[in-house]
Amino acid sequence: PLYDKVKRKHISQMTYFDYKNEVIITPKEWLEKAREKKLFYFWFAWQGMINFDFLKKIKLKFIDGIFAEDCHFGVLLFALSKNIYIFPKQICIYRLRELSSMNFTNKKWIIHPNSHLKKIDVFENSNTTRLYYESASWMQIALDFIKFIDSNHYLSEDIKTHFLPVVCNKALTLKKLDKDPLCLKKCTKNLKIYIQNQPLGAVDRVKEYLSYKLAKELSRKKGILRLTLPFSVIRVSLQHQKDTIEYKKSIKRNVLNKRLPLEFYRDYQQALSLKNQKLIQSLHGIGLKIMSLKG
């Protein structure tokens, strides 16, 4: 992608899939590669060509008005294909605009007066509105994946066990929100079955965050021991920075060393609750500043 007023290092999907030569693969091979590389999100829209006669035949369309519609479209397109031709050379540029709703790097999020998103603009906080929009989008993707799974396609079970759990976990965030303008919260009860076999691990991952470590250190220092807090913060921050550097080196050695996303785990929602505790949130910014100073 070409980032318009957005600073972001980008690693393409092709890098993770590690296709270096032209090759024709089957949908089963594509899915096995995604599983091997631990890729739980797959998207496809601008980065390839499609036989439109085939597209009309399978009656696949983008879901209107959602976030990450290319994830839904890409997974089902590749699953329903007969063959997939891989051309590993990058020959087109995707421009990512600063205020686009599809700008996944975007910190600033504005709903324009004529936007289709005005119907969900019922929250008092733009960040909450954005969270609802994304969660509701993942819900619609999850429901369409489930419809595909119920069609008894030969890849149904693979989609169910590999791509669906992370989507369901993202959609279940709807339960935390007090308003539901699209009336999708009622569907959350149907999703839990698809994450029940996932391992635990998200809460433990959050406990590795610098903000959590600082919060824990702060809670341990009582009375006169508070005087030693600055030294403890520096010690914890330096050790965290060292661990982070080692982790980044391990990824460079082998991309498979990259940690699984939090939403892969069954306890994702509990991890979000821990992550969003006020003390941990307030220390997150402090932790980032410390890391930038030490870096």
Which residue ranges define each predicted feature?
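Intrinsically disordered, low-complexity N-terminal regions enriched in serine/proline/glycine
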Residues: 15-18, 93, 211, 239, ...
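Membrane-proximal transmembrane or re-entrant/amphipathic helices at the cytosolic face
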Residues: 245-246, 251
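C-terminal subregions of glycosyltransferases and related glycan-biosynthesis enzymes
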Residues: 95-225, 230-233, 251, 256-295
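Flexible linker/loop signature enriched in Pro/Ser/Thr and Pro/Gly
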Residues: 228-244
